[in-house]
Amino acid sequence: MVQAKAGFKAGVQDYRLTYYTPDYTPKDTDLLACFRMTPQPGVPAEEAAAAVAAESSTGTWTTVWTDNLTDLDRYKGRCYDLEAVPNEDNQYFAFIAYPLDLFEEGSVTNVLTSLVGNVFGFKALRALRLEDIRFPVALIKTFQGPPHGITVERDKLNKYGRPLLGCTIKPKLGLSAKNYGRAVYECLRGGLDFTKDDENINSQPFMRWRDRFLFVQEAIEKAQAETNEMKGHYLNVTAGTCEEMMKRAEFAKEIGTPIIMHDFFTGGFTANTTLARWCRDNGILLHIHRAMHAVVDRQKNHGIHFRVLAKCLRLSGGDHLHSGTVVGKLEGERGITMGFVDLMREDYVEEDRSRGIFFTQDYASMPGTMPVASGGIHVWHMPALVEIFGDDSCLQFGGGTLGHPWGNAPGATANRVALEACVQARNEGRNLAREGNDVIREACRWSPELAAACELWKEIKFEFEAMDTL
């Protein structure tokens, strides 16, 4: 029988005696996390922050004698800094450093299980939100990242110098496979680069996945032949099991599709990483939808900020990721949105608190993920979208294409004309933020499709105060 070491003292002691270390200087190899923390009344901020560090690393609620069988100083998380949140009562930013050895190589699943596991139900906290993570380069290098990345995607598609243009097929549910393929063809023939399955299209009684894949691929090939442009459709391979997901991906490869899609949050990071690695091995692009993200990222004081999910998805693997629009129907303040957009596609991003970036992040040359602006956007938004997101983005219109009064193909043409006009105006030195509406009106003179779209949506706005603010 193993005996406890002499000197072991059973009982409960304050977390801060072990896990609050304000004199600690983080190492380059540490994983750093920033939590927005709201302690329960009467709980000191230092104790609450130390509790977060403990419960997300080596600690438990009482002293255990097996602590003596390891080196806690080597493995414990440490709260090294604590800041009051400006303009908020009883809220604090707790900065915690975690040793590299706490995490399995190449596993987003393991990182999140530690950082946002049981600690979020801790009674000493009224609320807790993971605001940001700094992944050390030593850990970054164990991840594959996006299957291909922005540069390789452009080379595959032979499309340069402008944002990519897409459309989500609507109605999202209820179409037969043949009618679905017809809508895909009309949109691609009208001028779009991509069309897309909506997130909840999988394999339902009204349209089984195999039928959809075949009719969609026929539409892609027909549109490519008629336009002499590379086209694609995001075939959603998300399924109830990983085995079924991979079966659908293999079939998509067999019929020649260039890109597939996964709902990463509902499907899970393990499934997503598996699919991303397969996509790189098989030369298939991977579009990622973020369905369910707002359940955990929309509340300001509890959950996980989307910038964390975006970083994790880039490591797990995805060539596209939905990122909000700033100007459409979905949540997203400009500074915050562009902060995590840069974290998706840039190789090195400096700390910038004004944009919600709490740590400098070096991705060590990992390929970037292209942001997808989608949700309640139409032709009048085009100048702002081009000005905000730049060329390395995908502008994804659903109702803003299929809602055109003349049909799907004219709707696609209207969007393509608006995009080309805005890119040309920008390249000529015009300021889209000031002159965007004039650019669109000028283009309407020679595009009746665009003129009809502008007339239809001239009064449509989504003006609600953003909740995602600093």
Curated annotation (Swiss-Prot):
Keyword tags: Bacterial microcompartment, Calvin cycle, Carbon dioxide fixation, Carboxysome, Disulfide bond, Lyase, Magnesium, Metal-binding, Monooxygenase, Oxidoreductase, Photorespiration, Photosynthesis
Molecular function GO labels: magnesium ion binding; monooxygenase activity; ribulose-bisphosphate carboxylase activity
Record PTM text: The disulfide bond which can form in the large chain dimeric partners within the hexadecamer appears to be associated with oxidative stress and protein turnover.
TM ranges: none
Annotated residues for binding of Mg(2+): 196, 198-199
Cofactor: Mg(2+)
A GO cellular component annotation in the UniProt record: carboxysome
Residues involved in substrate binding: 118, 168, 172, 290, 322, 374
EC number of this enzyme: 4.1.1.39
Residue numbers of N6-carboxylysine PTMs: 196
GO biological process: photorespiration; reductive pentose-phosphate cycle
Site annotation Transition state stabilizer: residues: 329
Catalytic residues as annotated in Swiss-Prot or TrEMBL: 170 (proton acceptor), 289 (proton acceptor)
Subunit relationships: Heterohexadecamer of 8 large chains and 8 small chains; disulfide-linked. The disulfide link is formed within the large subunit homodimers. RuBisCO interacts with the C-terminus of CcmM, and can be found in complexes that also include carbonic anhydrase (ccaA). RuBisCO associates with both the internal and shell portion of carboxysomes.
Family membership: Belongs to the RuBisCO large chain family. Type I subfamily.
Extra remark beyond the main annotation: The basic functional RuBisCO is composed of a large chain homodimer in a 'head-to-tail' conformation. In form I RuBisCO this homodimer is arranged in a barrel-like tetramer with the small subunits forming a tetrameric 'cap' on each end of the 'barrel'.
The protein's name in its UniProt record: Ribulose bisphosphate carboxylase large chain
Organism: Synechocystis sp. (strain ATCC 27184 / PCC 6803 / Kazusa)
